[in-house]
Amino acid sequence: MTQKIINNTLADDRVKENYIFISDIHGNHETLGLIEQAKKDFPYAQLVTGGDYIDGRDSVKEVLDYLIEQKSEGAIVLLGNHEQMLLNYANECEHQDGIWFFNSGRDTLRQLLGEVATPEELRASRYYRFLTGCPIMYETPNIVFVHGGVRPDEKYNDPATYNSVDHGFKIDYDFYRIWARERFWYSDTLNKKIAHNKTKKTIVVGHTPTCVLEGVFDDGRLMNRLSPDHCIVRKMQYPGEPARIFTDGGSHSDPLIYPHNDGNVVVLDGKGDVVKVYNYNDPQGTEVEE
């Protein structure tokens, strides 16, 4: 029974009875209470957090402090694109300070360090040290946990197959996994044809508020957009294939307009089936029948 990190993937050959997954907390303190309720109900479950803990609401510091503690107790904490933007700013690479600041980076710096800290000051912080030690993906025999997605084909875990350029941006394995949207969802992006999942594993992601998901399946079924205050857990799945499970509950939305988008804490069994979901509407959790 081993865990090892290769290509920013934490690979685990064990199958746990249950997994607790939460992504896209975005500084939302209320989400921490949902996690604690899930941990109380499933005390032996493996906690996996899927990225985007910063940039958004007012409790970024409390969220990262909580995750640092949880990791020390065995939680698996993954990176999202917002953490990567923070690291890019700290490492003074690319142009991510502009993109990150557009996505609430200044507010995150003020919450973490009391000011809009310089890259050097950020590199000296415990938060930088913590985030640099986080992998991008966690893979079990039956499940892939990742922030944005992986290519839903047989070579999903082969870094060499990801290299490309899109609208001037270099796409590689790490970039895809934290930023992927349409390329992960669709086989035909123009016509929004929902792709098959050929990885033979359930893929559990955050990154995109589930209310914006839409598309058409090969068999004619439709996935329609939902209202922005209804970011429930959703699946893209064909018969006989494992699901792609989307969990982002919309915590990066305006808290004055959508105050109860507190995220979705999802409990899965070892096969990757959803067992229970905790959110604002169901803080004690709702059981799910597959």
Where are the language model's segments positioned?
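Active-site environment of divalent metal-dependent phosphoester hydrolases
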Residues: 26-30, 55-58, 83-87, 152-153, ...
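N-terminal active-site segment of His-dependent metallophosphoesterases
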Residues: 1-66, 70
